[in-house]
């Protein structure tokens, strides 16, 4: 059967400059012809720096953005970042000493950081790591992640979405998806054609009597959910496909049209948990959010090796939209600084 999504992998050349060290558990976002990179770890649980790195797609060189304004003080891992307009939004993360960061923006025109929200205060979002983040034109969304504890009684992982209204500068929690919804970290999280999709991720069992894949209450999930802001309703989505991805977390993902595109990820955690590499994938899959059918994609000979705990985003390079992947953890448990782009050539 002919594949409905065609594309090709390319390795993005990096010619030098102030190049970020290899890392995982960091955040990236693209504004115009610039890629921004923040946070990360190497080795496990060792945060690296608090510099904001800038990659120029025209010169293929790196630089460090000016550190003006309310610069985040903590060197963080397990953080996430998105772009809306000309601003970056960075949420959460922590260092080895369990010092957690808050919510900031960075104006790429003024080249200035701005403190936005103190996390862990009553009535607002709680501090966290290994969460997921996405955005639309008016909102920044944060899903899941691992709890610090904070002032509110909270499970070890979250199952709710926090929505930040950019114009109003206010947070609101979207409707709770219910007890059957898994609490997850490192899940896929995207806005696709106006709806919020949560898929796969590392989950905590709701019922302690339920046996899990690892003999504990933590496991890789394969469930897919969708939230419609128009109706304020959650739906668990039953997907199909001859080549359907196995359970996983910590994978790269992007939205292109009606498609959710994923790559790699952790398909089995390491016996030493985050200290080890686990079993990592180099498979690529695409979900048609209209037909709800998964299919595998290959993308030619230039394909990333097995990896997880990457940073990823949707962007356009050379006129083609696709999935950009930076850094991550390899099967050797080493971190990488490689950058790859899966360019979508056609989709039906």
From Swiss-Prot:
Enzyme class, first EC level, given as a word: lyase
Keyword Aminoacyl-tRNA synthetase part of the UniProt annotation: no
Pfam families the UniProt entry points to: Kelch_KLHDC2_KLHL20_DRC7
Site feature: Essential for catalytic activity: 45
EC number: 4.8.1.8
Keyword Metal-binding: yes
Biological processes, Gene Ontology terms: glucosinolate metabolic process; nitrile biosynthetic process
Effect of residue 152 to M: Normal activity but slightly reduced proportion of thiocyanate in favor of epithionitrile formation
Function: Specifier protein that contributes to constitutive and herbivore-induced simple nitrile formation. Catalyzes allylthiocyanate and corresponding epithionitrile formation from allylglucosinolate in the presence of myrosinase. Also converts aliphatic glucosinolates, such as indol-3-ylmethylglucosinolate, 4-methylsulfinylbutylglucosinolate, 4-methylthiobutyl- and benzylisothiocyanate, to simple nitriles.
Name this polypeptide is given: N-(sulfonatooxy)prop-2-enimidothioate sulfolyase
Source organism of the structure: Thlaspi arvense (Field penny-cress)
The encoding gene: TFP
């Amino acid at each position: 059967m002919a594949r409905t999504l065609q594309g090709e992998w390319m390795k993005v050349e990096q010619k030098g400059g102030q190049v970020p060290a290899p890392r995982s558990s960091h955040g990236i976002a693209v504004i115009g012809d610039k890629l921004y990179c923040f946070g990360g770890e190497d080795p496990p649980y060792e945060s690296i720096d608090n510099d904001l790195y800038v990659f120029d797609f025209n010169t293929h060189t790196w630089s460090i953005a000016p550190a003006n304004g309310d610069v985040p003080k903590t060197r963080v891992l397990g953080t996430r970042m998105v772009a809306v307009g000309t601003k970056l939004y960075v949420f959460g993360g922590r260092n080895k000493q369990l010092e957690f960061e808050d919510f900031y923006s960075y104006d790429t025109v003024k080249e200035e950081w701005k403190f936005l929200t103190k996390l862990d205060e009553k009535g607002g979002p709680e501090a966290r790591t290994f969460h997921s983040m996405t955005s639309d034109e008016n909102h920044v969304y944060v899903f899941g992640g691992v709890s610090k504890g904070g002032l509110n009684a909270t499970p070890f992982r979250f199952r709710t979405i926090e929505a930040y209204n950019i114009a109003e500068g206010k947070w609101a929690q979207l409707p709770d998806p219910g007890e059957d919804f898994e609490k997850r970290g490192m899940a896929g999280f995207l806005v696709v054609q106006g709806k919020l999709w949560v898929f796969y991720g590392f989950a905590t069992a709701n019922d302690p009597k339920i046996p899990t894949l690892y003999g504990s209450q933590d496991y890789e999930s394969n469930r897919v959910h969708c939230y419609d802001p128009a109706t304020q309703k959650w739906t668990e989505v039953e997907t199909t496909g001859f080549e359907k991805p196995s359970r996983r977390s910590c994978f790269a993902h992007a939205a292109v049209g009606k498609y959710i595109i994923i790559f790699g990820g952790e398909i089995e955690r390491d016996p030493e948990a985050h200290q080890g590499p686990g079993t990592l994938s180099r498979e690529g899959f695409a979900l048609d959010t209209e037909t709800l059918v998964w299919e595998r994609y290959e993308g030619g000979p230039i394909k990333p090796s097995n990896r997880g705990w990457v940073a990823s985003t949707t962007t356009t390079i050379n006129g083609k939209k696709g999935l950009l992947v930076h850094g991550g953890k390899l099967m050797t448990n080493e971190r990488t600084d490689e950058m790859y782009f899966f360019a979508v050539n056609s989709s039906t």
